[in-house]
Amino acid sequence: ILVANRGEIAVRLLEEAPSPALTPELRITAYLPSGGPFVR
């Protein structure tokens, strides 16, 4: 589970359209314009 400034939205987007080529950390930054803080 990823938690970020927009955690719930980002995680839902990742679950709906996962990108196997990228790690979860890289994928979540795509949904956070600031590339903001997150924890795994």
Swiss-Prot record:
Keywords: ATP-binding, Biotin, Fatty acid biosynthesis, Fatty acid metabolism, Ligase, Lipid biosynthesis, Lipid metabolism, Magnesium, Manganese, Nucleotide-binding
Catalytic reaction annotation: N(6)-biotinyl-L-lysyl-[protein] + hydrogencarbonate + ATP = N(6)-carboxybiotinyl-L-lysyl-[protein] + ADP + phosphate + H(+)
Pathway membership: Lipid metabolism; malonyl-CoA biosynthesis; malonyl-CoA from acetyl-CoA: step 1/1
EC number of the protein: 6.3.4.14
Span of domain Biotin carboxylation: 1-40
Entry annotated with the keyword Lipid biosynthesis: yes
Cofactor, free-text remark: Binds 2 magnesium or manganese ions per subunit.
Cofactor: Mg(2+); Mn(2+)
GO biological process, one term: fatty acid biosynthetic process
Domain ATP-grasp span(s) in chain numbering: 13-27
Positions of disulphide bridges: none
GO molecular function terms attached to this record: acetyl-CoA carboxylase activity; ATP binding; biotin carboxylase activity
Entry function: This protein is a component of the acetyl coenzyme A carboxylase complex; first, biotin carboxylase catalyzes the carboxylation of the carrier protein and then the transcarboxylase transfers the carboxyl group to form malonyl-CoA.
Subunit annotation: Acetyl-CoA carboxylase is a heterohexamer of biotin carboxyl carrier protein, biotin carboxylase and the two subunits of carboxyl transferase in a 2:2 complex.
Protein name in UniProt: Biotin carboxylase
